[in-house]
């Protein structure tokens, strides 16, 4: 494990960690509020009041403006912003993505960040946008690789050096880039050029980008999802192993009169009530907030409170082993987020390697829960059950079951398992009495596999009449099938 990053707790791909920097230790996952050196809606010194432990600002803006540059060189970055905690600096790559060029070299901006005392330095990489031709993505990735190799040789101080992972929307390029950077031993790994995906709500593709990048990195590496600032998607990103986010949304949205919640964004003019209990929303009514002279500042503060409240909830869910339940709740806030959730579970084999083998009670939240790592893990381990003689499978206790050699409980979305394991994780799951189609499909598929793995056993399957599914007929071909209402022990 990296000496500067310590993982304390894990759930799914998410983790609570400690990131050590020259200006203090930061607990992750967390958000870095973006500070515009020219326009500060909320002073950096007040950011701790909202829960911020680390900030991010743009070194290129400071470098290009002489009055900011001179103060930063004289007093340091922390003196310029009036913040004594860790500060990360971007290099100008954002301006490069917007304007197509910047008036600084990689070595110049690296040296400037080092001189002003940035805690996390970012090289001048090439942010290749989504959907470009493969050749362009490959060529720009090669330039980025050269710059990052030069940066690794250039920065040898105690300051942390970030190695941005690029590769556009090509998973193979993302994984290749991440694997290369892993060998260079950067301290932080930002995933770059993903803002266009988030702005277009292309969460399924974002999931693929994150997964590919993570597969190329060490599991112990801290990962920063560049430009992710809306709390509605934090849980999904954390579950995939993202540790750091940065948010300019709190200020940009406030300027446009937008009010952030974990379920989406409201325009304040359309709000009759404030669905929040932060200090701002507890003090003002919706009408008072609309008419306030400092409305932009108040909205910015609310947006920060809402952002960090979600981070705290995510951390608690990691502690409780409930992160995926939160992800499934949050991803129902928008159809495109639901696409992201479904895409996440296509990576369940990878996620299962990261997910703890034991944790809190499994809660079934909907059809997507059937694809969770716990279910996949159970399906992989069916060959561990050796069954002989007469075997009864039932959803709940039935008369005469003790006459059988072995008793199995049937519980969707798992399938059949020994009755002795009913109170053991994950079989102590909270599930609906009547399973949906996807849940039943997974459970019956696993049951068929279990029956086929034990050809010497004679199976009796007692199920509910409500179990309407084509696989029931496949069960009937391999076992004696009786509906519970018809069960009579002779």
UniProtKB/Swiss-Prot annotation:
Substrate binds at residues 125, 193. Zn(2+) binds at residues 276, 278, 281. It is an enzyme of class 2 (transferase). It comes from the Archaea. It catalyses: guanosine(15) in tRNA + 7-cyano-7-deazaguanine = 7-cyano-7-carbaguanosine(15) in tRNA + guanine. Binds 1 zinc ion per subunit. GO terms for molecular function: pentosyltransferase activity; zinc ion binding. GO terms for cellular component: cytoplasm. Keywords: Glycosyltransferase, Metal-binding, Transferase, tRNA processing, Zinc. Gene3D superfamilies: Queuine tRNA-ribosyltransferase-like. Pathway: tRNA modification; archaeosine-tRNA biosynthesis. GO terms for biological process: tRNA wobble guanine modification. The active site is at residue 90. Its cofactor is Zn(2+). Its EC number is 2.4.2.48. Belongs to the archaeosine tRNA-ribosyltransferase family. Exchanges the guanine residue with 7-cyano-7-deazaguanine (preQ0) at position 15 in the dihydrouridine loop (D-loop) of archaeal tRNAs. This is tRNA-guanine(15) transglycosylase. It comes from Methanosarcina barkeri (strain Fusaro / DSM 804). The gene is tgtA.
């Amino acid at each position: 494990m990296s000496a500067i990053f310590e993982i304390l707790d894990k759930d799914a791909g998410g983790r609570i960690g400690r990131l050590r920097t020259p200006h203090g230790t930061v607990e992750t996952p967390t958000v870095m509020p973006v500070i515009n050196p020219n326009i500060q809606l909320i002073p950096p010194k007040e950011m701790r009041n909202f829960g911020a432990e680390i900030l991010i600002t743009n070194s290129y803006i400071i470098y290009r403006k002489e009055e900011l540059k001179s103060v930063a060189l004289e007093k340091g970055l922390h003196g310029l912003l009036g913040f004594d905690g860790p500060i990360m600096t971007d290099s100008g790559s954002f301006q490069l993505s917007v304007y197509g060029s910047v008036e600084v070299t990689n070595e110049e901006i690296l040296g400037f960040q080092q001189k002003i005392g940035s805690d996390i330095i970012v090289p001048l990489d090439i942010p290749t946008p989504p959907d470009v031709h493969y050749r362009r993505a490959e060529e720009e990735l090669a330039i980025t690789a050269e710059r990052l190799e030069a940066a690794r040789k250039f920065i040898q101080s105690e300051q942390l050096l970030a190695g941005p992972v690029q590769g556009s929307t090509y998973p193979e390029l993302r994984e290749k880039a991440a694997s290369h950077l892993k060998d260079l031993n950067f301290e932080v790994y930002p995933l770059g050029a993903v803002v266009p995906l988030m702005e277009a709500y292309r969460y399924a593709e974002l999931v693929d980008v994150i997964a590919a990048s993570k597969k190329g990195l060490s599991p112990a590496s801290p990962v920063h999802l560049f430009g992710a600032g809306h709390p509605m998607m934090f849980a999904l990103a954390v579950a995939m192993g993202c540790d750091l986010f940065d948010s300019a949304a709190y200020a940009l949205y406030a300027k446009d009169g937008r009010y952030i919640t974990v379920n989406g964004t409201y325009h304040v003019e359309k709000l009759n009530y404030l669905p929040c209990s932060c200090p701002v929303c507890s003090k003002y009514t919706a009408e008072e907030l609309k008419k306030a002279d400092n409305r932009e500042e108040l909205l910015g503060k609310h947006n920060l409170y809402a952002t960090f409240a979600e981070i705290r909830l995510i951390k608690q869910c990691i502690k409780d082993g409930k992160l995926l339940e939160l992800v499934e709740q949050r991803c129902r806030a928008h159809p495109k987020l639901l696409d992201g959730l479904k895409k996440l579970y296509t990576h369940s084999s990878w996620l299962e390697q990261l997910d703890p083998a034991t944790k809190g009670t499994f809660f079934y939240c909907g059809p997507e829960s059937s694809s969770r790592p716990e279910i996949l893990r159970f399906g992989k381990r069916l060959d561990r059950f050796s069954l002989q003689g007469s075997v009864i499978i039932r959803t709940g206790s039935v008369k005469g079951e003790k006459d059988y050699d072995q008793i199995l409980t049937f519980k969707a979305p798992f399938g059949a398992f020994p009755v002795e394991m009913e109170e053991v994780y994950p079989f102590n799951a909270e599930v609906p009495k009547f399973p949906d189609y996807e849940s039943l499909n997974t459970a019956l598929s696993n049951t068929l596999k279990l029956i086929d793995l034990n050809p010497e056993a004679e199976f009796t399957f007692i199920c509910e009449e409500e179990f309407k599914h084509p696989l029931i007929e496949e069960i009937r071909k391999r076992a004696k099938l009786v509906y519970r209402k018809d069960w009579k022990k002779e």
